[in-house]
Amino acid sequence: IDSEGGLHEAHALGAFNGTNPVQLAGAYAAFGNGGYFTKPYSVSKIEYIDSGKTVNLKNKTTRVMSDATAYMITDVLLYAVESYGNIGGTVPGVSLAAKTGTTNYPDEVLRENGFPSSAINDLWTAGYTPEISVALWYGYDTPVPGYYNTGGYIKNNLYRRIVDAISDRNKKQSFDVPSSIVRVTVEKETYPVQLPGENTPDDMKVTEYCKA
């Protein structure tokens, strides 16, 4: 580990070199693709005018996780959007699984630029539907006195509008549940997880996905 520039909280998750929206969209797409990752690409085919020959270009697809793991992550992120409104709302007619994130300015940057403690450096939203994967970054490359973010309203509204505009409602808009998982009713607050007994009250039962 090269700590010459100092260690940061994100290093605990392996984020040494940062990321960008294209990489993030590609990573999240693997959850929606049942655990298969395809490196994002811009050109899908080349047509030669002189010969009429067509060359199809596709990146290699690699399984990076089981379909069970991929769907259980999807289920969590669907719940985050639909129940907690982590992107400020849902997109009508679209099953959207998404996660938001922010990074804060260091104290010295807040002082140097006169920013309030609530100022946010980067705002991210990454998510996917059964059809598309979209990642959005909103922020400033360098601090500018007088300009800063303190909330995600603009970013979340923009993200929902993008997903809404490019989603094709004529295509399938729900995720398939793989046969490798089952729904099981268990007792809350038990570890290891236990099945409910005959005397377990209903408010202490919860139904979740588990690997079959």
Model-based region annotation:
Residues 1-26:
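Mid-domain, small-residue-enriched loop/turn segments at the edges of structured enzyme/sensor domains
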